UniProtKB/Swiss-Prot annotation:
Belongs to the isocitrate and isopropylmalate dehydrogenases family. LeuB type 1 subfamily. Binds 1 Mg(2+) or Mn(2+) ion per subunit. The gene is leuB. This is 3-isopropylmalate dehydrogenase. Its EC number is 1.1.1.85. Substrate binds at R98, R108, R137, D226. It comes from Haemophilus influenzae (strain 86-028NP). GO terms for cellular component: cytosol. InterPro entries: IsoCit/isopropylmalate_DH_CS, IsoPropMal-DH-like_dom, Isopropylmalate_DH.
Amino acid sequence: MQSYNVAVLAGDGIGPEVMAEAMKVLNKVQEKFGFKLNFNEFFVGGAAIDHCGYPLPAETLKGCDEADAILFGSVGGPKWTNLPPDQQPERGALLPLRKHFKLFCNLRPATLYKGLEKFCPLRADIAAKGFDMVVVRELTGGIYFGQPKGREGEGSQTKAFDTEVYYKYEIERIARAAFEAAMKRNKKVTSVDKANVLQSSILWRETVTEMAKDYPEVTLEHIYIDNATMQLIKAPESFDVLLCSNIFGDIISDEAAMITGSMGMLPSASLNEAGFGLYEPAGGSAPDIAGKGIANPIAQILSAAMMLRYSFNLNEAADAIESAVQKVLASGHRTADLADDSTPVSTAEMGTLITQAI
């Protein structure tokens, strides 16, 4: 029997509540599909600060090093906002984890499920078509990290500058991740650039076009970033995998998230070249609703499904979870963030319904 070690970092706010439901679902699929997940739980974020004084304790990092994947909840909250920036939960835990594991590839799915069209802010006829896409964003290169960057001069002569830098190998590895993702989906990649203006985008387009030769089954399209933001609003159903540089992916992934209508539904993954991943909901720790049993656990559950698919290659089990989510939503069950009536299901009830639908 295949066996995998999972470091479980529930974190703060609604993290522990929604993580409990993801574990419920994972226990069901491992039993049904015949593999073994060994869960090891560790403190992270504010919970770790309260427990031992550090947002990312050595014991937690060691546990992650020994794991095959990290299932992450959420970190942060008003309790810890007065700490020095590098000791706050987000900057002191999540960013060091990304750096330590060299997580260069961010996957952000955005799906509009049947029955949830009215939450989509787009025109009704566009929302009625639905959409199911994933944004593949390069995380470690580009203008956020390029040198030189800085600020100099005085008065009206003050200037500030940033540099967009991409090496070919950085583009090759993120392009490969996008094509591999497309192979597990609808076999279409739309590469986003600004090759009519930027040298970095010209290299991006050339490199992605070369990489496409290794994936003859996948259709490749190129689109300028300005047009991409328009087409996301006009025809989101036309996209499958969107391949983006760091800054373009930052913008596009948030735009795609917003048109789904609920952040509580959106998972994400950050991967390194070995396929090791950190999987987490795209939303935050929502301290205002923590402990009330009303948080939507679907983003955490779908993050667990992504872990099965992208780190463990357990596609059948991942499909089963995603289908169960669709089934439960189609049958009209909603948590408070999506409920039409005065009787929404609780966090635990939603987790149980999805587990039963597998």
